[in-house]
Amino acid sequence: MIKTIVSTALPINERFAIRKNIIKNGKGNRRVCIVTGTHGDELEGQMVCYLVAKQLNEHIDLLDGTVEIYPALNPLGIDTIQRGIPNFDLDMNRIFPGNPNGTMAEQAAHLIVEDLKGADLVFDIHSSNLYLRETPQVRINVLNEKELVPLAQRLNIDFVWVHDAATVLESTL
């Protein structure tokens, strides 16, 4: 099921819309969210979301709970392959948790955070831009190390980085 989280009118009969794909099965009440597309020039996350949704739908009987996939938090940036939100000169990942009374982008960030509340786990997928290649990695804030490192070790990724840099970037998702 596709649900619209944010929908705002734009000039020339266009809409700024953020949607999520809800895949649910069984009676389980656990909820996992996967978000990507915060930066419009980081495209690998859309492929990951597609593959996860495909696998879940092909093996729905193995799912006992809910997975919510947000493939494009910055759809305007993705459409134009720009890191930030075009014409706003704004990095969306620096305005969380947003503001319900702020600009369009701040309102969108607020609605995203509100929609993610209550999730048991949120994966925020980032990648390099079109001109760089990085080693796959998991970044975990030191405050969540005890809970998240055991989960990260199950991802078959060689580089798990535990750091406290999120205290410097308090406005990131």
What are these regions, as identified by a protein language model?
Residues 1-173:
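Structured catalytic-domain cores with a bias toward divalent-metal coordination
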